Design a protein with these regions (language model features):
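Iron-associated oxidoreductase/ferritin-like identity signal
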Residues: 1-162
Length: 162
């Protein structure tokens, strides 16, 4: 790419007129795919280590929903002619059940914040992708509420200290 092409692309992006508007949407989908796959794996791990049997089923359900999100995103990527990105493995932790739930809640909040920013970036460019990501955002809110409920049931006092 020559200097003139780089300069004109810079101006297009600076003014919000990207040469390839779907490229941003694809980048968002790739990032969300990796994140949903990692979260599905993480929630499965939390469920397997959970000392509270009543929470085990709920964590497995969240993991399955995360896996379904990843499948939906994968379908969009394939439909756009893209290869699925490699998903780095999660590292295992030896934290207690309560700390795992708290970390899961923090992760859901961080992910939700990222998703809001990503949606702003592609809102008008790709309504089909925006709709999928908004659906995922709604389910993330439900997950946060469920995790918060589990935390309060496991140790209500500890949640007020965090």
């Amino acid at each position: 790419m020559g200097f003139g092409e780089k300069w004109s692309e810079w101006w297009r992006s600076f003014l919000g007129f990207s040469q390839d508007k779907s490229r941003k949407a694809v980048d968002v989908l790739r990032q969300r795919y990796i994140e949903e796959m990692q979260q599905a794996d993480r929630f499965k791990g939390h469920a397997e280590k959970m000392h509270y049997p009543q929470f085990n089923e709920k964590l497995h359900a969240i993991a399955n929903e995360k896996g379904r999100h990843a499948e939906q995103i994968a379908e969009k990527l394939v439909a756009l002619g893209c290869k699925l990105p490699a998903v780095p493995e999660n590292t295992s932790s030896n934290e207690n059940s309560w700390r795992q739930l708290l970390n899961a809640l923090d992760e859901e909040y961080r992910s939700a914040d990222d998703l809001v920013d990503q949606l702003r970036g592609i809102l008008s460019d790709r309504p089909d992708i925006t709709e999928l990501l908004q659906q995922i955002s709604q389910e993330q809110k439900k997950h946060r509420d469920e995790i918060r409920e589990m935390l309060m049931r496991s140790d209500p006092f500890a949640l007020s200290l965090s």
